[in-house]
């Protein structure tokens, strides 16, 4: 045990020493984080969570969410005021602020600041680029079929050899002047504005894109709160405060002095990509990271029986936040596979055999069992509804196997056990444990599971090509509306967010009917009816909604749980004096102390 603790202390010391390297001129206002692996800093390509969140630090969007308002509320970001909607409910008029500038960068060749001003032309260019078929933007779903002419533009670009179509534009994006533009929708869509707050819809500089070319994804030039100082792939990103960021304040800041300071409050953010969870954990304990998630394997050392922080960590000045996530986890069936698509009874049997209680144990209780795709707290989630196929019941599952023509799991064509593949997007011990649970559950009804543990690249390649049978995945909501989760079953989204390739004319009819509906009890009732309908078709095994546990040191200020605070870092601050004082008293904690023994 002593050797283990000594080794862990050495690892911590190594990371602690690296924190000081290149940490900047003013470490007092520097925040240190462990971030996920960033693939790209191109907003139109940043479909993964780590990239999306990082993009939000460098770029700005037309709208944002009020950081403290509940329920969630959209407010202007790059706009002077909320956009005006005409009587037809299809035309929005936007007016940009006049203090928006792209950050200083080599691509502007020392041009005057006024030449870096963000204009309506930049907005239109950014949105057209998402629609450019040659880019294959994975976030085109935001605009597809919603903005007049965007679908035709996408088709035309696939045949174009230059960018002349950008000059021609489309009817759905009209420039009035440098600060005013209009967006014409194909039909009323009360949720359209949500898309304009997602980092995918960030406004980029055409000049920067042309200057950097293929390396644009590594050189962000935005009008957001931070600018890139350094990016060493798979190791570290360093972000500096963007002094040209528009004037914005946070009147609810913990520190009274910070309430009068323009955002961002931090001078620097250092993001490490630490692959080993134990290294990140030890670095956090010694004050080298300002906040930390809690890994599955470390949960018992951190959280006690009453979901409270263990005494040793509480004494260290660490705070625990529990937050239900706007996320649904599920096991999907491939509806491109006739075996699964054409046999509802088989899907019912598999759903009933899946033991969610074991999954809950696997996650240390950090989840809420799901009855459908809509998370708790969202209009359309019916707390009284019970999905008939979400209750673990082996007896019923075996009966459905018989009705599916696979009695006791035997394939009548071969006389052997029905065999299905099961894909996951990771190969760690946690994924292996989940695979073992699946093998055990399906074995009880005679199905043989062949687990496929993939890296993320291979996993999503399989999903795009439909080369799978069963797969486990999650969906993190992009905006606070049930439609964002129901779209995962819409046939026109098959191959993109509809990973199961589910196609159902009746569901499509229901989905298209709710698109133009305003928020109302009637719309909420429609959502509930759609969930009940899906429960009878078993397109997924509706597994769970995640609950995240996060740890903060007390010197980190202004952290507010928020599912859509994409640019959260601009509000955060650190009390440097408190950090220095607290770290002086830190000493390595033994496993005995961590466990409160």
What annotation goes with each model-predicted range?
Residues 103, 184-203, 220-279, 303-327, ...:
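Aromatic-rich, solvent-exposed beta-strand/loop patch
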Residues 34-87, 221:
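N-terminal lobe/hinge region of extracytoplasmic solute-binding protein
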Residues 121-206, 223-232:
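Surface-exposed binding/hinge segments that line
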Residues 33, 284, 441-491:
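Periplasmic binding protein-like
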Residues 240, 251, 341-440, 444-445, ...:
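Append "and occasionally in soluble cytosolic enzymes with long acidic Gly/Pro-rich linkers
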Residues 36-56, 106-112, 138-139, 190-201, ...:
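A structural "hinge/loop" feature
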Residues 81-142, 182, 280-283, 340-342:
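Aromatic- and charge-enriched surface segment that lines or borders ligand/interaction sites
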Residues 20, 315, 348, 352, ...:
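Extracytoplasmic/peripheral linker and loop segments enriched in polar/acidic and small residues
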